[in-house]
Design a protein with these regions (language model features):
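N-terminal export signals
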Residues: 1-20
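All-alpha RGS (Regulator of G-protein Signaling) helical domain and cognate RGS-like helical scaffolds
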Residues: 7, 21-247
Length: 247
């Protein structure tokens, strides 16, 4: 009995010693280099303005691409050209704002967003060759620009620049509203105010949009060729995120 107890004590001591030297790290084979932690990127006002430039440039490039402008009918071609000119002019104004806020102007399309959905838009437009897709795409892109500025308002630190972001967003929203009317004219999307009978419009009332102003959800647009027994491609276009900010 004593021998057994001694063996148990000795065994327990060995186990305790082994347990104390167990490596609880993740097992791996070979040498692994030490990884440097990612640096914290600062989303400065200049970075937001540079990103806005990249979005404006991207939209101008998409609308002026032959896959879009080349299939537009005569009326839409004039409209699209005017929108391209507006985005190009905006680049000049944004460039001055970037410089004033200590940044370097960025006159290139947003590469991350082009990979995410811009290239798909051009590919689908080239495959579909539908003139009827030009104005809906224009409306979607203008809505994207408006949502981008609205999102950036909350991130802008300079109060004067924040007000300018609001103005830029309002201008983009007006262009989106014009494009929407070109796609489907009328007042179907407006909320009307009526008398108690529910049919007579209230005198002096002003029609308003029923939904909340400036949604920030992804903008959707249907593009591409017709597919037998299947819906056409639906492209989701979202505003810039932290990995698509031009720092």
């Amino acid at each position: 009995m004593l021998r057994t107890s001694g063996a148990l004590v000795a065994g327990s001591a060995v186990l305790a010693a082994c347990a104390g030297s167990v490596d609880t790290g993740i097992a791996r084979i070979g040498e692994a280099p030490e990884l440097d932690p990612l640096a914290e990127a600062e989303v400065s006002d200049a970075a937001l303005l540079r990103t806005a430039m990249s979005v404006e440039k991207m939209v101008a490039n998409i609308l002026s691409d032959s896959s879009v402008s080349g299939v537009a009918d005569a009326a839409a071609k004039t409209i699209v050209a005017a929108y391209v000119a507006a985005h190009t002019a905006r680049l000049t104004a944004l460039s001055a704002l970037v410089t004033a806020n200590g940044g370097q102007p960025y006159n290139e399309p947003n590469e991350k967003l082009m990979v995410a959905y811009g290239d798909s838009v051009l590919k689908l437009m080239g495959e579909g060759k539908k003139a009827s897709d030009v104005l809906p795409l224009t409306h979607a892109l203008e809505s994207l620009v408006a949502a981008t500025y609205q999102y950036f308002v909350a991130l802008t630190t300079n109060s004067a620049l924040r007000a300018e972001m609001m103005r830029l967003g309002a201008q983009a929203s007006r262009r989106a509203a014009v494009a929407a009317q070109l796609v489907s004219s009328g007042i179907k999307a407006f909320g009307m105010q009526y008398e108690e009978d529910g049919t007579t419009q209230l005198e002096g009332s002003v029609p308003t949009f029923a939904g909340a102003f400036g949604p920030l959800n992804a903008v959707q647009v249907t593009l591409g060729p017709d597919v037998v027994d299947a819906p056409r491609a639906n492209v989701l276009m979202d505003t810039p995120s932290l990995n698509s900010i031009i720092y």
